[in-house]
Amino acid sequence: MLQINSRLAVIDGWLVDTVKRKPINFRSPEVRLLLPNDDDYKKLSQQNLVDWTRLKKDSNSVLVGVKSMELFKHIKLVLREFFLLEDGRIILKRIRSKSRYKVVKKLTCKCCRLYLPKWGTVYIHPMLKDKEKPLAGVCEFSLDVNPDREYPLIEINVSHQYIIIEGFLLYLNERRLYRWNDNNLRGQVGLTKWAHLRKTYNPVSLDILYSLNSNFYFVKDDLLFQLLGKRVFVKFCKVMENGKCGKAPLWYRVKRTTTAKATHIAYAISNSTAPDSFKSKNNDYRFIVREKPIVENTISNLDYSDIKKQQFTEAEVVKRKISADISQIENVHTQFNSQKEKNNIRVNKVSSEILDQISKFPVSRVTLLLMSAGQDKNYIELVEELARRLEKICIEKTTQSLEEIRDTFQANPEMQARFDKEYYQSIEEYKITLELIKEDLLITLIKQMENMWAAEKKFSTEEEYVSPRFLVADGFLIDLAEEKPINPKDPRLLTLLKDHQRAMIDQMNLVKWNDFKKYQDPIPLKAKTLFKFCKQIKKKFLRGADFKLHTLPTEANLKYEPERMTVLCSCVPILLDDQTVQYLYDDSIIPEFEATSSYATKQSKCGRKMSLQMEPDLLFQEAIRRMRHLTAYDVLRRNYIAAFEELYMGNCND
């Protein structure tokens, strides 16, 4: 270190104001004011000083490492949070929204801010040389989240999602913590499932925190702080009995502080959100504290083992009391609970790696599956947009049908008010059902659409004319005169073909017609030439859950046809030796969907006459039955597939 005068010094090429403890740009007009003596100024100009503009030119990041431990002993450092982007740049956390690159890592370090005219702001931080030890109180940290760790994801009626981390129940939709012993939550979950989840996961950490005399609770898992987002900087302080000094502190408390003095990060919870019995006039906040310090403070005389022991001892007592109170509530409510719980509660496992990719909750199970499979972000966004459009189509059609039923009671306000209770409940229920259908069907439908360009059965694609009349293509022998495929073993070929032509056919790998007898349902093919030269007929089939075609039911089962999906498909018939007919269809074309079955038509006609023919009570019962039918899983599922086909064929102008 070279002392220029009583205030300025040069440390490893940096000009430092030792009074204000900050670096000074040599090109700044401030320097001349601080060095009125010409000899001092000349002495300074002879030094090999760092050119600040090179800091920005040599780095695309705002965080620049400097290998000078001596420098950082004489300047002030503050704690700042940064993001490491996938393109290698490091940016300040508050400008994250302006970047289109994915965040790879979140980090925080103590650094010094430098302002460069025309270049902007950079932050310098200490970079260790070989065999150097870090400065006391100066270190870099980042939230250390284990990407493989899994957490219980609780879904309530599909649209409300919670996660449990170290006993804290986090409502992901709002990124807000909830007490487990909360009346609203208990009513939403249902008493039986509420009790089961408590016994399985015991998410009572927030209840414990509110019951502690201490104002802090340690957490090891960094994912909680990552999901909660906004963090504060804190330090621990000692509290003496009755405010008097004693030989030893009786208690430790957490206090918010500046980034320069902070030892830990924490999430602050206002006491205003606590139950009245837990509120304290002297303490406005309680803190969930990250157990791992952000700095190793060698100056502090606090013993962290005593702090942890304080929390553990107090928390164990409180935990037993809370568990006993909740068990008593469960026993009391169970005796008087006779209502059937209708809420749809599901618990799944989700990894922190997947959670880190989600910007907004709730997130559908379809999206979670695609993320787990490592699908591209753009592909997932396309699937989400498709799901949104399908849901919109289904909701519009179903709501329109329900409105028609509701209009039946326009002339009777009393009956309409009675019906509306069931009506609005059905709307909520069918929206949940649609979400379940999306989970069951959407990925299957998309895969089926993608497979429409792949052959289900791989035949030879070579095209070769055996004679002017017969063509071999797609594994079939095609009779161009009759425009149909023909059995290679057909006796007529003895007179229609010469010996060398029949020998040519025998050497080819053609479809064996006896194999067709093994199939009861139509056979999907990827055979462009076959469908180009052969006559096709329109025939009705049933489409199953596997998105494949099946033969129509027999006369005995015909009554079940309304509950199945009927489609009209172009196909090539094949007459087999036993006089049975098999059908080949092109699976790259989606068949026409018969949106209105005879059953639906009949119901529509009955609906128009219903108000004229029925007594009010019978009319109400019939309306409820029709509404239940329209919102049933099977009907909504059929509508969902129909909407998918409409979008695929381009017939929907959504």
Swiss-Prot record:
The keyword Repressor applies. Pfam families: Sir1 (PF11603). It comes from Saccharomyces cerevisiae (strain RM11-1a) (Baker's yeast). GO terms for cellular component: chromosome, centromeric region; nucleus. Transmembrane segments: none annotated. Residues 322-654 are annotated as: Sufficient for interaction with SIR4. This is Regulatory protein SIR1. Residues 449-587 are annotated as: ORC interacting region (OIR). SUPFAM superfamilies: ORC1-binding domain (SSF144005).
